[in-house]
Amino acid sequence: MQLSPQEKDKLLIFTAALVAERRKARGLKLNYPEAVAYISAAILEGAREGRTVADLMNYGTTLLTRDDVMEGVPEMLTEVQVEATFPDGTKLVTVHTPIR
């Protein structure tokens, strides 16, 4: 299988998000990389489904709460930026203050 660098990045995000999803389901608090992967994967999937950039920017703030992550993670994670592929092309989605 030959993947472009962007496809490899998406695969890495998905794999990390899968680990984060499983840990969250078991009641474990997510660390910084897991939280970023969890939010990023949800944004990528939403773009694939055809949701708008504005919708995804808002959606990204609803995925995790302070109770879902380790202490200090909300303060470290001030924004998440994901280059997502939409039906009409690739766009940058920025989620400001994703953990509230």
UniProtKB/Swiss-Prot annotation:
SUPFAM superfamilies: Urease, gamma-subunit (SSF54111). Pathway: Nitrogen metabolism; urea degradation; CO(2) and NH(3) from urea (urease route): step 1/1. This is Urease subunit gamma. It is found in: Cytoplasm. The gene is ureA. Heterotrimer of UreA (gamma), UreB (beta) and UreC (alpha) subunits. Three heterotrimers associate to form the active enzyme. It catalyses: urea + 2 H2O + H(+) = hydrogencarbonate + 2 NH4(+). The keyword Ubl conjugation does not apply. Transmembrane segments: none annotated. It comes from Thermosynechococcus vestitus (strain NIES-2133 / IAM M-273 / BP-1). One of its GO terms (biological process) is urea catabolic process. PANTHER family: UREASE. GO terms for cellular component: cytoplasm. One of its GO terms (molecular function) is urease activity. Belongs to the urease gamma subunit family.
